[in-house]
Regions:
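Substrate-binding/active-site clefts of carbohydrate-active enzymes
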Residues: 179-245, 251-376, 398-405
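Short, positively charged and aromatic/hydrophobic N-terminal segments
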Residues: 9-12, 28-41
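Conserved, mostly hydrophobic/aromatic
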Residues: 73, 178, 238, 248, ...
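Aromatic/acidic polysaccharide-binding cleft in carbohydrate-active enzymes
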Residues: 181, 425-426, 432, 438-439, ...
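Active-site-proximal helices and loops of the catalytic beta/alpha 8
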Residues: 282-291, 299-300, 305-316, 380, ...
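Cationic, low-complexity basic patches in intrinsically disordered or flexible, solvent-exposed regions
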Residues: 18-19
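Carbohydrate-interacting/catalytic domains
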Residues: 40-174, 179, 185, 191-194, ...
Length: 659
């Protein structure tokens, strides 16, 4: 949280005297002792506090109500500190606490002050320090991993419910995301009952239909016939990647190929198959230790749906057809029937009133509600589309019902930013402090990995992003985080790593990576995916990325899987990563600590149950000599001495410390 004009809480009757944000006693020293001497003294007066290090704060990360937290701040003795106060506030100012920190000890040139406190209830809190000295007082704020006087950020501290748990099977899992129409087709493609018009491609390897209609509409109504049986047929292939969670994009009956325009929540799209086919797929997955997670699209429906029925393709009386429709209250009409609230102004996606009692009954609470229906058929959880648009009250009702039906079901939300402090539509969300979501899509990790791999960051930004998420999220959420590099909403990762082209759809359809670009992209993807699979959380592989698929954003990131045309070396690389992670509990569950994050080199440890792994990535142009250990996986790695290894440029490895 950025500080702009945050009021200070100070001791005594008089506020600190400041000039342009600096305490006057420092400015007086500038005058009395000279500018150079002032700068020297300021450099020597660096105050030490980093909430991510145990010497300054324990426990690490989030708290539960009533749990004791200990803070230690190191202040140079030359500051002549007389009192240190840590000031906590919740966001709306309804709760505040001032913790006076006691002098603990002197360590070298530093005085160490310590304070202990607890927080009474779940919520999001922020804090800073006020330091009294013999010459005056000043506030201390956060600046990256460092501190800064009178300007900067507040430290964040989340308090989560003590009974907030997440599914054990989802912790450290490996996820495989499938866009159902484009993965694999088996048997006859059923078109009976399919919403019209549609196009069925004659060849699996044809280009996706990217051209708009004569009226300028993009219909997304071209299909290749991927289905449940096709996924079942390829379940051994999916398992060979070390996958433990299969996440499917929407499967309900819909007009489009992406199926985010739901037509009938409780009916599978005819082209995908029947409910029996779906259950068979789930059983095949479960037999291989793979759970099935579905896409829950509860922010909007399709205009061509059982509920809205603008196109009159359903026998029901939809909200568009009559104000007496049982679904009329689901929607907001400004001028019925043609003017209504729609998702991002797409008139084919009318937005629903999430807290409408009839909608809640249909989706959540009825005996055969939508969430109950698919769980009974074999699903193990839901990824919630545009979670930011689902009210916290809706999410709590949904969680209660899902956990009642299947206590270890997974609820994963689509959130693009730091979900611990996310503000959406003017409201701070309570995904974790309210115990609503088990996990979220970890787009911040994706950004951090891409910036490091593309040499836009030397390593420090990567470390700051990773540790910020790990600190801000409860550990049970961190372990379930969906760590992705590519999805149906991003360019293919191979393309994203080397080509930021942003031309027209026609240009993108014709544009492909050159041989040189592809070589660089594959090299970068190998290291990016290595980081993805060695960080805390659950790596997620978008179908076909392991095969070398390329393409820009929708629809070019949704081409068909290239069966028989895969990149064999890349496929082997991802299988190795899958085996590494599946066979190593330290990577699935371990804590993380960085020991290197600059000069285009990243190094961190993963520790669990007394075992430590060391992870190295070298993006620099020079070799990196590292301590020897048991090599679990390595690339461009050489032994130079019994106790030392050399990691060449563009090399990466993970080693287990010798006992």
């Amino acid at each position: 949280m950025k500080v702009f004009d945050f009021p200070a809480i100070v001791s005594g009757d008089s506020p600190p005297q400041q000039f342009f944000g600096f305490p006057l006693f420092f400015l007086r020293e500038m005058v009395y002792n000279g500018f150079i001497d002032y700068l020297t003294r300021m450099a020597a007066m660096r105050i030490l506090y980093d909430s991510k290090q145990s010497q300054f704060k324990t426990p690490f990360g989030t708290l539960t109500p009533g749990q004791t937290c200990t803070l230690n701040i190191h202040i140079p003795a030359s500051v002549l500190t007389t009192k240190v106060t840590c000031i906590f506030n919740n966001e709306d100012g309804s709760w505040a606490q001032s913790v006076e920190m006691a002098y603990r000890m002197k360590k070298g040139a530093y005085d160490i002050f310590q304070g202990r406190f607890s927080i009474p209830y779940p919520g999001l809190f922020f804090y800073y320090f006020y330091i009294d000295t013999k010459n005056g007082g000043f506030r201390l704020f956060k600046q990256g991993d460092d501190t800064n006087m009178e300007a900067g950020d507040l430290w964040q501290l989340s308090c989560v419910p003590a009974d907030f748990t997440t599914p054990d099977w989802a912790k450290g899992a490996t996820i495989y995301q499938v866009f159902p129409d484009r993965f694999h087709s088996a048997g006859r493609v059923h078109t009976e009952g399919k919403l019209e018009p549609y196009t069925l491609h004659k060849s699996w390897y044809e280009e996706v239909d990217w051209k708009p209609t004569a009226e300028g509409q993009v219909l997304n109504n071209d299909f290749f016939g991927g289905n449940f049986r096709g996924i079942t047929e390829k379940m051994d292939y999916i398992a060979s990647l070390g996958v433990t969670i299969l996440y499917l994009n929407p499967i309900s009956k819909s007009f489009s190929s992406h199926r985010y325009d739901t037509g009938d929540y409780k009916t599978p799209d005819p082209m995908l198959g029947t409910e029996a086919d779906f259950s068979d797929m789930c059983r095949a997955a479960h037999a291989r230790g793979i759970r099935v997670v579905l896409d829950g699209v509860y922010s909007h429906t399709g205009s061509n749906s059982l509920y809205f029925n603008r196109e009159k393709a359903f026998p029901s009386v939809g909200a568009y057809n009559s104000k007496e429709s049982p679904y009329y209250s689901w929607y907001t009409f400004y001028d019925w029937p043609d003017t209504y609230h729609s998702w991002w102004d797409f008139d084919t996606l009318p937005t629903v009133n999430k807290m409408d009692p009839a909608f809640i009954r249909y989706i959540i609470t009825d005996e055969d509600s939508v969430v109950a229906h698919w769980l009974k058929l074999g699903a193990d959880g839901y990824r919630l589309d545009v979670a930011d648009e689902l009210p916290d009250e809706f999410l709590r009702l949904l969680r209660d019902r899902v956990k009642q039906l299947k206590p270890d079901a997974l609820l994963l939300g689509e959130v693009w930013e730091d979900a611990s402090n996310k503000c959406a539509y003017g409201k701070r969300r309570t995904y974790f402090t309210g115990g609503e979501l088990d996990s979220v899509m970890n787009y911040p990790f994706r950004t951090a990995i891409l910036n490091f791999i593309k040499n836009l960051d030397g390593g420090r930004g990567f470390k700051e992003t990773v540790m910020s998420i790990v600190e801000n999220y409860p550990p049970q959420v961190v372990a379930c985080n969906m760590n992705l590099l590519g999805t149906h909403d991003t360019p293919r990762i191979l393309t994203a790593l080397v080509d930021d082209f942003d031309g027209s759809r026609e240009e993108k359809a014709k544009r492909h990576l050159s041989r040189n670009q592809l070589t660089v992209a594959v090299e970068r993807l190998e290291m990016a995916s290595f980081l993805q699979y060695t960080l805390p959380g659950s790596p997620s592989l978008y179908y076909g990325d392991e095969a070398g698929m390329e393409g820009y954003k929708d629809p070019f990131n949704r081409r068909t899987y290239p069966w028989g045309r895969e990149d064999p070396e890349l496929l082997t690389h991802f299988r190795r990563l899958g085996r590494l992670r599946k066979g190593n509990e330290v990577l699935r569950q371990g804590d993380i600590q960085f020991f290197q994050a600059e000069d285009r080199r990243v190094g961190f440890t993963r520790t669990y149950n007394g075992k430590t792994l060391r992870v190295y990535c070298n993006r620099s142009g020079d070799p990196w000599d590292i301590p020897s250990g048991k090599i679990l996986l390595g690339h461009n790695l050489h032994t130079i001495a019994p106790d030392w290894l050399t990691l060449s440029p563009k090399g990466f490895c993970v080693t287990e410390e010798w006992k």
